[in-house]
Amino acid sequence: MKKIVFVLVLMLSSFGTFGQETASRQFGDAFSTPIAAEVNKKACDTELPPSDWCCEVCCNPACAGC
């Protein structure tokens, strides 16, 4: 009987952990895109980006190959 209770508790705790991981991954994906888009918009709206600015983020015309 103790083994059955132990197995049930273990299964429930594993399910809870898996559910939290899946939920946090979904929320992370949902929030990352708008934040990245907002950062790109603000960065690209600046007139003079810093010299070490990454071309992949803003496609800075000063960088070759954008």
From Swiss-Prot:
Chain residues in the propeptide: 20-50
Recorded superkingdom: Bacteria
Chief place of localization: secreted
InterPro entries per the UniProt record, alphabetical: Heat-stable_enterotox_CS (IPR019806), Heat-stable_enterotox_STa (IPR001489)
Transmembrane residue ranges: none
Keyword flag Signal: yes
Protein name (Swiss-Prot/TrEMBL): Heat-stable enterotoxin
Gene: yst
Signal peptide (from-to): 1-19
Similarity annotation: Belongs to the heat-stable enterotoxin family.
Subcellular location per the Swiss-Prot or TrEMBL entry: Secreted
Keyword Plastid: no
Keywords, sorted A to Z: Disulfide bond, Enterotoxin, Secreted, Signal, Toxin, Virulence
Single GO molecular function: toxin activity
Its job: Toxin which activates the particulate form of guanylate cyclase and increases cyclic GMP levels within the host intestinal epithelial cells.
